Amino acid sequence: MLSRVFQQFFPEESPDFFKNLLKSIMTIDDFQVLVMSKFVRWVLEHTAKNFSYDGISNIDPSKKFLALSNHRDIILDPAIFQLVLYNNGIPMTEIAVGDNLITNQTIEYLIRSNRMIKVVRGITARELYLSSQLLSRYIRLNITEQRSSIWLAQR
């Protein structure tokens, strides 16, 4: 399955290229730069006539932040945002993703390899309250201690 996916985004490369590429990935940043940025560029080239953004100069690369977005496209929007950050020399964010989008173990590995935080859904009200508190503490700690920025979609 993965070889077919890679072939789509790296059509000029041999299957050995994919094996070597995967072996060369040592960090999440490596994965995001070597694989995900290529994927996002491919999506933009094949689905958009034009892509522009503004306001990036309002982000201080030396500080961590919380990026809030609407719930329009929970996968593609943050992926594009990561590419914009990367292209502007700003560290990429962690991304909160609902567990309803994690359909199998392979998807979970891919999501976690892309600096994503699993948000548990479909639980009791009490469990949701406790889970939300834990997520809030995690976000606050990461930002206030300058560990990482967070991207979060809201409804």
Tell me what each language-model feature is.
Residues 1-65, 71-82, 86, 108, ...:
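Membrane-anchoring hydrophobic helices of lipid-metabolizing enzymes
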Residues 46-49, 128-133:
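A conditional alpha-helix N-cap/helix-loop micro-motif detector
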Residues 69-70, 78-79, 96-99, 122, ...:
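Glycine-rich, histidine-containing beta strand-loop boundary motifs that form or position
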Residues 94-130:
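Conserved nucleotide-cofactor-binding alpha/beta core module
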